């Protein structure tokens, strides 16, 4: 059984990672603190221990990836959360992004469509540190209407169009951060739901995400 240790060396590498992310333009100190607090190497196979704090994506279970820390920080900063907000995350993956959000003091409702990943995260001891994360197995396009409305929605996969069912589950004044596009490169957008029901869209930088898929995978 794997033994999880967060050594002084790991903490030193994490500080360097935070500096790298900061130099790339992340300014939100709370987001930087969250990256600094979370042992990213816990979320990866032990084979990646030496490189876990490089600013790049790595493979995890079910042909999925743990996102580049800069991307996680970028989306978290754009989401602009405040403590106790309800956040819907589509695509739990490694649960690293969910942990960053949990460090920011929000209530995270995260959906994973890959059953093996969902079950792995349910057994991942480190995540017990965050009682403010609730894990769900399901189709991200459907969201979680039972728990709506949400203050924020974070999509961690590329969507060709705005998922309107998720917009309906947002509060008035709520924000969605979503990488949009059907090619290899997507544009990060932030969509705000206005009082009159209209959507205000802000366009940001380009990224590369795996596509957001319909349905569940047993």
Residue spans for each PLM region:
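Conserved nucleotide-cofactor-binding alpha/beta core module
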Residues: 80-200
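Class I SAM-dependent transferase core
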Residues: 1-88, 96-100, 104, 117-120, ...
């Amino acid at each position: 059984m794997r033994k999880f240790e967060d050594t002084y060396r790991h903490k030193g590498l994490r500080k360097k990672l935070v500096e790298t992310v900061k130099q790339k333009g992340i300014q939100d100190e709370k987001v930087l603190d969250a990256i600094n607090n979370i042992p990213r190497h816990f979320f990866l196979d032990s084979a990646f221990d030496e490189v876990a704090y490089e600013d790049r994506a790595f493979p995890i279970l079910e042909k999925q990836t743990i996102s580049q820390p800069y991307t996680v920080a970028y989306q978290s900063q754009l989401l602009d959360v405040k403590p106790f907000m309800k956040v819907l995350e589509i695509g739990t993956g490694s649960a690293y992004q969910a942990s960053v959000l949990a460090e920011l003091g929000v209530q995270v409702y995260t959906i994973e469509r890959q059953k093996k990943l969902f079950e792995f995260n349910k057994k991942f001891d480190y995540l017990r540190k965050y009682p403010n994360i609730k894990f769900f197995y399901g189709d991200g396009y459907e969201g979680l209407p039972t728990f709506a409305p949400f203050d924020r929605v974070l999509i961690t996969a590329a969507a060709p169009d705005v998922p309107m069912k998720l917009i309906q589950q947002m509060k008035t004044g709520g924000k969605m951060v979503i990488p949009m596009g059907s090619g290899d490169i997507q544009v990060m957008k932030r969509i705000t739901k206005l009082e009159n029901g209209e959507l205000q869209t802000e366009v940001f930088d380009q990224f590369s995400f795996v596509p957001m898929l319909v349905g569940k995978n047993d």
